Design a protein with these regions (language model features):
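Cytoplasmic helix-loop-helix junction between adjacent transmembrane helices
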Residues: 59, 65-103
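Helix-to-loop junctions at the C-terminal end of transmembrane segments
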Residues: 22-34, 225-240
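Juxtamembrane intracellular "pre-TM" segments in multi-pass secondary transporters
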Residues: 147-177
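C-terminal transmembrane helical hairpin of 12-TM major facilitator-type secondary transporters
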Residues: 240-285
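Extracytoplasmic gate region of multi-pass secondary transporters
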Residues: 171-228, 286
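Conserved MFS/SLC helix-loop-helix module at the cytosolic interface between two early adjacent transmembrane helices
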Residues: 21-59
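Paired small-residue
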Residues: 49, 60-68, 270-274
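Helix-loop-helix hairpin linking two adjacent transmembrane segments in secondary transporters
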Residues: 99-146
Length: 299
C-alpha cells in the first residue's frame, strides 16, 4: 500500500475510534462480569481484527480492521485497573498501575527496532500474524490464570444510568477530564503515532535511526514505570498525594514539550524521550479516579 500521512492518521484514528467508543459499555461490563470474561471476549475481537488486517487487500480493509482491533483491546487497560481496585489494598493501586504500564511498554518496545529488523525478512503481514499468535497465547493465559469475578445481580438500565450519572457529576472526575483529553491523549498520539514520522521527515533520521529512537524512548518509559511503581507507595507514606505529584510534574512536562517546539527541526529522540518521561505523572490519574469511587463502580 502506498499510504500518505493522512492515511496513516486515519488508521491510527480508526484504532482510537474503536477503543474510545467502547469505554462506557466496557466499564459497565467490567463491573458486572469482571475483567477475566470481558478482556477475554474482547480480545477475540482483537484477534479477528489483527488477522483481518494482515489479510487486507485495500485501505478500507485496513481501516475497518483497525477499528476492530481498537474495539478488541478496549478493555485491556481498564480491565486490569478494575481488578486491581478489588484485588489490592489502596496503597498498592499506584504501583499495580505503573507496573501494568511498564509491561505495556514491552509491547511498544517490540514494535520499534525489532519490527524494523524483521520487516525486510518477513514483511508487515507476517508481523501481524505473529501478533495474532501472541494474542491467542494471551487469551489462553487469561482464561487459565485470572481470578474469577463474583457475579453481580442483574441491574436495570435505570440503575446503570444512575451509576453513570453519579460518575459524571463527581467534581473530582470532572477535574480530571482535561488531563485525560489533552495531556494523556497528546502523549499517546506522540508516543504511538507522531514521534516516528517527526524524526523521519522533520529531523532527518533514517528509518533505522527513527526506529532506534523510538526503541530507546520506550525503553526509558519501561524503566521509568518500574521505578515509579516501586517508589510510589513509599512517597505516599510521607503524605504526598497523587494530585500533588501531578501538580509538581505537569509544569516540567509542559517545559519539555516547549523544548520540542523551540528546537523544531532539531528536536530528536532525546527531547521526545524527555517529554514522555516527564509526562509519566499523568498515569496517576487513572488509579486516583478509581479510588475516588466505590469498588462496585471501578469499571
Amino acid at each position: 500500500f502506498d499510504l500518505t500521512a493522512g492515511n496513516l492518521g486515519l488508521l491510527a484514528g480508526g484504532y482510537f475510534i474503536g477503543f474510545s467508543l467502547m469505554q462506557i459499555p466496557v466499564g459497565l461490563l467490567l463491573d458486572k462480569i469482571g475483567p477475566k470474561k470481558v478482556i477475554g471476549y474482547f480480545l477475540i475481537i482483537a484477534l479477528i481484527g489483527t488477522i483481518s488486517f494482515a489479510l487486507a487487500k485495500s485501505f478500507t480493509g485496513l481501516f475497518v480492521s483497525r477499528i476492530f482491533i481498537g474495539v478488541g483491546v478496549s478493555a485491556c487497560m481498564m480491565g486490569p485497573l478494575t481488578g486491581y481496585r478489588v484485588w489490592f489494598a489502596e496503597k498498592y493501586q499506584q504501583r499495580a498501575n505503573s507496573w501494568m504500564l511498564m509491561v505495556a511498554n514491552i509491547g511498544f518496545v517490540s514494535s520499534t527496532l525489532p519490527v524494523q529488523i524483521l520487516l525486510p525478512y518477513i514483511g508487515w503481514r507476517w508481523i501481524f500474524i505473529l501478533i495474532a499468535i501472541l494474542i491467542l497465547f494471551s487469551l489462553i493465559l487469561i482464561f487459565l490464570l485470572i481470578p474469577n469475578w463474583e457475579q453481580k445481580e442483574s441491574t436495570s438500565i435505570k440503575s446503570e444510568k444512575e451509576s453513570l450519572s453519579q460518575i459524571w457529576k463527581n467534581k473530582f472526575f470532572i477535574s480530571m477530564i482535561p488531563l485525560a483529553f489533552i495531556n494523556y491523549g497528546g502523549i499517546q498520539a506522540i508516543q504511538t503515532l507522531w514521534a516516528g514520522p517527526w524524526m523521519l521527515n522533520i529531523t532527518g533520521y533514517t528509518p533505522l535511526q527513527s526506529a532506534t529512537g523510538l526503541f530507546w524512548i520506550n525503553i526509558t518509559m519501561l524503566i521509568s514505570f518500574f521505578i515509579w511503581g516501586y517508589i510510589l507507595p513509599k512517597i505516599s507514606e510521607y503524605g504526598i498525594s497523587s494530585i500533588k505529584l501531578i501538580k509538581l510534574g505537569l509544569p516540567i512536562s509542559y517545559f519539555s514539550l516547549f523544548l520540542i517546539i523551540y528546537f523544531g527541526n532539531n528536536a530528536g529522540a532525546f527531547l521526545f524521550t524527555l517529554y514522555i518521561m516527564t509526562s509519566i505523572v499523568i498515569s496517576l490519574t487513572q488509579p486516583a479516579i478509581a479510588l475516588n469511587f466505590s469498588k462496585n463502580l471501578a469499571g
